[in-house]
Design a protein with these regions (language model features):
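Short, flexible, solvent-exposed loop/turn segments with mixed acidic/basic and small polar residues
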Residues: 5, 26-28, 81-86, 144-146, ...
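Bacterial N-terminal signal peptides
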Residues: 5-17
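Core segments of cupin and vicinal oxygen chelate
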Residues: 29, 38-75, 80, 110, ...
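Ser/Thr/Gly/Pro-rich, low-complexity flexible regions
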Residues: 168-172, 214, 259
Length: 269
């Protein structure tokens, strides 16, 4: 893990809490919206401060669960040393829109954190990659018209079977295929674009890595789980209610090894 500089830790410790409210997108006609990404991190306090300071997040804690609320999705945190970074797994990175990519990158670099390639992205706008602690790989895309400083935008799967994986998601979650700029193999769920790209070699399953799993928020989750079971979908964790965190949950794994949590209740966080 790349260590944060002392100056960054001090800046984060005294950073004011953001004023803007953040929430999940309204669900589609099937009651589905994008929910969260769940990260395994070595130091939960470092991540709490980082996602607030740089991404305008709001910390929400319920029982043993720590989350960061952001426009369009949440980041859930578990304090556990990850088994590997995001890169090399099926879920290569997740992305945000920002008002000014260069300004964001300058702040990130000044804090002593790693900046990856800077380039013109698939939609013709300035993009950049930044590396957060624990191998969390994040893409930034500029959007000067953004009504908030930062908003969740996409998650990116990388696998040799990317076309089949896209078809699986569109079938299971009743989604349509829609290009994102030059990338033709993408789909949208409310709040998040899901992009799918090729890999020369097989990529690893996500469970245990820096990004452990992704999540969808579902109205009437119990009924949705019955629907998936009727389609032949097998669950790693069957539908259940977890009162301590005020969530209804279920877990499954996609054909590529991406671990998926289905939730009902994150829209109240």
């Amino acid at each position: 893990m790349r260590l944060l500089s002392t100056s960054l830790l001090l800046a984060l410790a005294f950073a004011p809490a953001p004023d803007a409210e953040a929430q999940l997108a309204a669900p589609n006609a099937d009651g589905i919206t994008y929910g969260h990404v769940h990260l395994n991190v070595a130091d939960i306090e470092v991540h709490k401060k980082l996602w607030v300071e740089y991404f305008d997040g709001v910390v929400v804690e319920k029982g043993p669960l720590t989350t960061i609320r952001l426009p369009n999705f949440l980041i859930a945190l578990t304090e556990r040393e990850p088994t590997g970074p995001m890169q090399g797994s099926v879920l290569d990175h997740f992305g945000f829109k920002v008002r000014n990519t260069a300004e964001f990158v300058a702040r990130w670099r000044a804090a002593g954190m790693e900046v990856g390639p800077e380039f013109i992205g698939a939609e013709g706008m300035p993009n950049a990659y930044v590396m957060a602690p624990d191998g969390v790989w994040v893409e930034l895309q500029e959007d000067p018209s953004l009504h908030v400083p930062v908003a969740g935008y996409h998650i990116h799967f990388i696998t040799p079977d990317y076309e089949e994986l896209l078809a699986w998601y569109t079938q299971v979650f009743s989604l349509g295929v829609r290009p994102r700029g030059r990338i033709g193999t993408t789909t949208d769920v409310p709040g998040m674009n899901m992009s799918f790209g090729d890999a020369e070699e097989a990529t690893a399953a996500t469970r245990g890595r820096a990004l452990d799993h992704i999540g969808f928020e579902v109205d009437d989750l119990e009924a949705f789980c019955r629907k998936l079971a009727a389609m032949g979908i097998e669950f790693d964790v069957e539908y259940r209610e977890v009162e301590s965190v005020e969530l209804k949950i279920a877990f499954l794994t996609d054909p590529s090894g991406t671990y998926i949590e289905l939730t009902e209740g994150y829209d109240k966080y």
